[in-house]
């Protein structure tokens, strides 16, 4: 099956003549000026230990805050910090929040820390947002992730402007990027406008800029999402489900975290039918954005799912739902396998392709109408999302299988090449 896919020199002429009437012409020119030397890029910032890096960013954030016109006491809420690529909360981002809260209470008494809730947001507080992102410190694309970028921002929701920024680089030693339970358990990763707007508001702004409008429009829903995540992480699955269902009814509530939350809470409550109905909506959301990444975990070096039944138990139901939703849309899919960077690139390329083939075959077994509408490809480790090479829960997305909407063509057997 085929898929549609100098310097300008300035010359001065001088004419002279002699009494004998013999004319002589002389021409002189200024030498061509060499082009100005290209300024060398500034050296990358020097990463420092995590504690020092966070303290620098946080102190810069609060000491430089533009509080002109603000009351003597400023209400501050923290919209939970996230990974700047995956959007996940983690042990590291939770630690950042704890350290920042303690710093504010001890050193910046003008700021009064309040809970992130719909009631507090209604009072137009100052909101602290932040991202924590693994990066190559020299900015080399595909280079080793040898630092973490800390980005903090204060958004005044009264004026809808950014009133301060704080940034720094941290060494990776001692940092625990293990995702919080909700994000660790979430089966699906897809492009999500709400998470993108949060990241843009932190990373894509400077002091004085307006808060991203999509972030401002969804901040009430974000507070509900946070309530749901906290309830899920605490094991209060019934409470989490109630919150997510309420969020779905709120403007801007149809977002990936909410849909994942409805699925996860129902699954934990052993409400299988409701869980799979919710998973179908997760699949629809991902396919609508043209790409859906599912965390299928395989045995090392194998095309077979891992043996841990507690993890792989829902895999068959996921495959059934992906096949059902794809068949119903009468569309075509590219099934793309990915690996982390561990191992030889050639082996990773082959293994990721074989895993994609396996998933493709399973989908076609579920829905015969998909035969001729799927193609399997392997990307190896060339499109890692996290890229830290830890090979644990923190970079599980690097070992994902993606379903990418593709135009339908004719012919071919759909095998990877």
Can you name each region flagged by the protein language model?
Residues 24-72, 157-249:
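C-terminal/domain-edge helix-coil "capping" segments
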Residues 38-52, 287-321, 339-346:
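Short, solvent-exposed beta-strand/turn patches at coil↔beta or beta↔helix junctions
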Residues 52-71, 303-336, 361-365, 403-417:
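Periplasmic peptidoglycan-binding/anchoring modules of Gram-negative envelope and division proteins
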Residues 60-61, 75-80, 106, 113-155, ...:
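A short, hydrophobic beta-strand-centered structural micro-motif
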Residues 69-122, 161, 366, 371:
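N-terminal segment of the mature soluble domain
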Residues 87-103, 273, 306-309, 338-417:
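Periplasmic OmpA-like peptidoglycan-binding domain that tethers envelope proteins to the cell wall
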Residues 225, 256-261, 293-294:
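Alpha-solenoid helical repeat scaffolds
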């Amino acid at each position: 099956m085929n898929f549609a896919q100098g310097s300008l020199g300035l010359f001065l002429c001088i004419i002279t003549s002699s009494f004998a009437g013999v004319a002589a012409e002389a021409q002189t020119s200024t030498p061509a000026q060499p082009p100005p030397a290209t300024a060398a890029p500034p050296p990358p910032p020097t990463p420092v230990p995590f504690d020092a890096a966070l303290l620098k960013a946080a102190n810069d954030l609060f000491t430089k805050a533009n509080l002109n016109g603000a009351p003597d006491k400023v209400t501050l809420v923290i919209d939970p910090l996230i990974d700047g690529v995956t959007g996940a909360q983690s042990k590291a981002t939770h630690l950042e929040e704890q350290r920042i809260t303690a710093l504010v209470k001890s050193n910046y008494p003008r700021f009064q820390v309040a809970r992130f809730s719909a009631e507090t947001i209604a009072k137009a507080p100052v909101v602290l947002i932040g991202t924590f992102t693994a990066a190559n410190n020299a900015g080399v694309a595909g280079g080793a992730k040898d630092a973490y970028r800390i980005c903090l921002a204060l958004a005044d929701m009264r004026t809808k402007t950014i009133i301060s920024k704080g940034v720094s680089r941290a060494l990776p030693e001692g940092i625990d990027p293990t995702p919080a339970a909700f994000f660790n358990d979430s089966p699906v990763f897809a492009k999500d406008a709400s998470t993108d707007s949060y990241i843009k508001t932190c990373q894509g702004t400077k002091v004085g800029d307006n808060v991203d409008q999509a972030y401002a429009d969804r901040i009430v829903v974000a507070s509900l999402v946070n309530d749901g995540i906290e309830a899920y992480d605490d094991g209060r699955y019934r409470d989490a489900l109630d919150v997510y269902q309420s969020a779905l009814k709120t403007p801007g509530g149809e977002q990936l975290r909410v849909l994942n939350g409805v699925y996860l809470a129902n699954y934990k409550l052993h409400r299988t039918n409701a869980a799979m109905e919710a998973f179908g909506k997760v699949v629809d959301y991902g396919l609508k954005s043209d790409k859906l990444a599912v965390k299928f975990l395989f045995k090392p070096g194998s095309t077979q799912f891992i043996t841990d039944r507690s993890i792989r138990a829902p895999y068959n139901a996921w495959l059934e739902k992906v096949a059902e939703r794809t068949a119903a849309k009468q569309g075509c899919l590219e099934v793309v396998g990915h690996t982390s960077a561990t191992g030889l690139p050639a082996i990773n390329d082959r293994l990721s392709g074989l895993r994609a083939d396996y998933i493709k075959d399973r989908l076609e077994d579920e829905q015969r109408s998909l035969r001729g509408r799927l193609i399997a490809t392997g990307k190896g480790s060339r499109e890692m999302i996290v890229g830290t090479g830890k090979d644990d829960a923190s970079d599980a997305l690097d070992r994902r299988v993606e379903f990418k909407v593709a135009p339908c063509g004719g012919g071919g057997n759909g095998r990877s090449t």
